[in-house]
């Protein structure tokens, strides 16, 4: 049986990003034989360094980037970076703005989020998204102490998309990749165990996910990254870490991001 092709989609906005989601839903409905991984959503992006970090990750994931940035400077940065690096990038706003300008001589006000009421929930979401981007992939372990959740797992256990998805729900989430050769940050010992989530995946499934990842990057040679014996070692190590830090463990095998997030939220509700 032929495996369905998968396209990873990054959605970037300086507001909620609802515009791109509506378009994407309409487009994906026309391709029933393609899997669109739409877990990577980055709303409230208003700093150039945040934007460039996301675009660099998009290159690594061979992703399609959809943008509804209304800020012309940020949009130009994204467009120029994408052109220079061969990144598939679709700007949904500025080509339309340009047509209006040519016809009327009027420029847009470039104010993000004018469709949405600026309430407490909105600003909490902004803060949570910025937090997830800042503390993704163990970049700054001191952020663990301010996190609602700390996600732990070996490579390709959905740590980043889960962080972003949960951030869209207002949770401050950081994550740390578990690599046997890399020492764990000491600050992890100070984190409330009930806030630590350990992510597991069946070895064979994880090997397949990693192989697909390498194939998407044009790398077809076998490496330790996809070697089943090495993956067993990584997962055994992660189980030791989970036990040491008393993490709440979730097996993500064959679960969608939404399903895993539901289980995490259910765990949090039981703590109240």
Curated annotation (Swiss-Prot):
Its EC number is 2.7.11.32, 2.7.4.27. It catalyses: N(tele)-phospho-L-histidyl/L-threonyl-[pyruvate, phosphate dikinase] + ADP = N(tele)-phospho-L-histidyl/O-phospho-L-threonyl-[pyruvate, phosphate dikinase] + AMP + H(+); N(tele)-phospho-L-histidyl/O-phospho-L-threonyl-[pyruvate, phosphate dikinase] + phosphate + H(+) = N(tele)-phospho-L-histidyl/L-threonyl-[pyruvate, phosphate dikinase] + diphosphate. ADP binds at residues 153-160. It comes from the Bacteria. Transmembrane segments: none annotated. InterPro entries: Kinase-pyrophosphorylase (IPR005177), PPDK_reg (IPR026565). One of its GO terms (molecular function) is protein serine/threonine kinase activity. Keywords: Kinase, Nucleotide-binding, Serine/threonine-protein kinase, Transferase. Belongs to the pyruvate, phosphate/water dikinase regulatory protein family. PDRP subfamily. Bifunctional serine/threonine kinase and phosphorylase involved in the regulation of the pyruvate, phosphate dikinase (PPDK) by catalyzing its phosphorylation/dephosphorylation. NCBIfam families: PRK05339.1. This is Putative pyruvate, phosphate dikinase regulatory protein. The lineage of its organism: Bacteria, Bacillati, Bacillota, Bacilli, Lactobacillales.
């Amino acid at each position: 049986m032929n495996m369905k092709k998968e396209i990873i989609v990054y959605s970037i906005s300086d507001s909620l990003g609802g515009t791109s989601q509506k378009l994407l839903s309409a487009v994906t409905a026309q391709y029933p034989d393609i899997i669109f991984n739409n877990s990577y959503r980055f709303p409230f992006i208003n700093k150039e360094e945040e934007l460039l970090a996301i675009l660099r990750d998009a290159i690594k994931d061979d992703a399609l980037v959809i943008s509804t940035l209304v800020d012309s400077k940020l949009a130009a940065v994204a467009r120029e970076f994408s052109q220079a690096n061969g990144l598939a990038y679709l700007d949904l706003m500025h080509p339309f703005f340009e047509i209006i300008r040519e016809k009327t001589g009027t420029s847009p006000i470039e104010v993000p989020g004018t469709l949405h009421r600026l309430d407490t929930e909105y600003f909490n979401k902004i803060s949570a998204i910025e937090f997830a981007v800042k503390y993704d992939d163990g970049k700054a372990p001191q952020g663990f102490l301010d996190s609602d959740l700390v996600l732990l797992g070996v490579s390709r256990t959905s740590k980043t998309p889960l962080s972003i998805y949960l951030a869209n729900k207002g949770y401050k989430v950081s994550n740390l990749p578990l690599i046997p050769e890399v020492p764990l940050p000491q600050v992890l010992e100070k984190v409330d165990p009930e806030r630590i989530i350990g992510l597991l995946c069946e070895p064979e499934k994880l090997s397949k996910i990693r192989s697909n990842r390498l194939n998407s990057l044009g790398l077809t040679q076998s490496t330790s990254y996809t070697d089943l014996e090495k993956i067993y070692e990584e997962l055994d190590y992660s189980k030791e870490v989970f036990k040491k830090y008393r993490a709440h463990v979730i097996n993500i095998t064959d679960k969608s991001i939404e399903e895993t997030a539901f289980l995490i939220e259910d765990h949090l509700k039981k703590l109240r």
